[in-house]
């Protein structure tokens, strides 16, 4: 639904138990703050409804960093993909259900954009 309301691409993501990582590219002069506010508030509403809870889901406001180079993009992509492994939740990043790498492996492309084949060949050995 967010992509119908705002124009943006999600390049990678990982939803952890207390935070989320997203590589998000706003398109057509969209506001990153407005996109994130909408995504995080809708997520919190659905999360609270699903678990019959009330109140805050997120500890703090979101923070953002601009990715300035291709090498920084690769390292950020890998950092996000490996987050559940570093947290010792899973042994392999592809085993964690709530991340972009798992979605890519399963062919689920409704949330994030599929990276080009050359990029996948470059990063995949560093993930699995």
Residue ranges of predicted features:
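Histidine-centered active-site/metal-ligand motif
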Residues: 19-21
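Short Pro-Cys-Gly-centered "Cys-loop" motif that presents a nucleophilic cysteine in a tight turn
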Residues: 1-16, 26-128
């Amino acid at each position: 639904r967010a992509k119908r309301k705002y124009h943006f691409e999600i390049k990678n993501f990982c939803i952890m138990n207390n935070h989320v990582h997203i590589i998000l590219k706003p398109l057509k002069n969209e506001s990153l703050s407005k996109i994130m506010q909408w995504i995080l508030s809708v997520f919190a509403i659905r999360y609270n409804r699903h678990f019959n809870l009330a109140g805050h889901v997120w500890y703090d406001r979101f923070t953002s960093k601009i990715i300035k180079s291709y090498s920084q993009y690769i390292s950020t992509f890998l950092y996000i993909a490996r987050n559940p492994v570093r947290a010792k939740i899973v042994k392999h990043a592809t085993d964690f259900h709530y991340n972009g790498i798992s979605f890519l492996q399963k062919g689920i492309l409704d949330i994030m954009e599929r990276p080009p084949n050359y990029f996948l060949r470059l990063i995949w050995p560093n993930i699995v």
